[in-house]
């Protein structure tokens, strides 16, 4: 009986792989926020309009939103090792958030900024 062996070469972790990982995570996060069938809780993906009856400057409400969003994103995106959610602006019909994260197999932090305006999420470039 003859044995056959197959050699498998694992891809090296290069800058391009890291870049494509980062792009992939950002693309998937934006899709998670933008999809009408998103598994995220409706309040987390539909922005501030749900808060019209509340005080948008309420720090407890903002903190609750950030904790809920962080928990949901960590559950749905397993490539994120660490995540911090920050509210940059919170108005009645506009919400700006910043996601600062560390990905597994990536040594550099990644910032992903989103703005809820006119009923949709828009990606913004970090400043």
Swiss-Prot record:
Keywords recorded for this protein, A-Z: Cytoplasm, Stress response
Subcellular location(s) of the protein: Cytoplasm
GO annotation terms (biological process): cellular response to oxidative stress; DNA damage response
Chief location category: cytoplasm
Entry superkingdom: Bacteria
An MF annotation (GO) of this entry: anti-sigma factor antagonist activity
GO cellular component, one term: cytoplasm
Functional note: Inhibits RpoS proteolysis by regulating RssB activity, thereby increasing the stability of the sigma stress factor RpoS during oxidative stress. Its effect on RpoS stability is due to its interaction with RssB, which probably blocks the interaction of RssB with RpoS, and the consequent delivery of the RssB-RpoS complex to the ClpXP protein degradation pathway.
Subunit organization: Interacts with RssB.
Similarity comment: Belongs to the GpW/Gp25 family. IraD subfamily.
Protein's name in the database: Anti-adapter protein IraD
Species the sequence originates in: Escherichia coli O1:K1 / APEC
Gene: iraD
